[in-house]
Amino acid sequence: MSFSKREAGDVWSILFVTGIVTACLFAGVSVLMRMRFPDKSRPEWMLAGLIVLGVFAIWYSLVYVRGWEGAALGMLGFNVIFGAIAGYLIDKAIRRYRKR
């Protein structure tokens, strides 16, 4: 099976969209939780959980899956990690803006 440039570009767009969706979901859930539970600090736990899941996906792709499928799973893990970090930073920016 051969991959054309169009098919390879489709894979990258899926990975970028996954990272963006993860960031948006993290920021949205974080803002909603801050509105419902202003005393509790849960975004840090969500960030830690998503980073652990991303690292686990990368480890699993390296050890068990391997090959191109493993590379795609590893990229998905990186996107979850960076999406979670971006969502956390977006949440911090929103909270700073709301305080003003």
From Swiss-Prot:
UniProt keyword Transmembrane helix present: yes
Transmembrane segments: 11-33, 45-64, 68-90
GO CC terms, sorted: plasma membrane
UniProt keyword list: Cell membrane, Membrane, Transmembrane, Transmembrane helix
Entry-linked InterPro entries: YesK-like
Membrane topology qualifier: Multi-pass membrane protein
Pfam family, one: YesK
UniProt main location, coarse: membrane
Subcellular location: Cell membrane
Protein name in UniProt: Uncharacterized protein YesK
The species this protein was found in: Bacillus subtilis (strain 168)
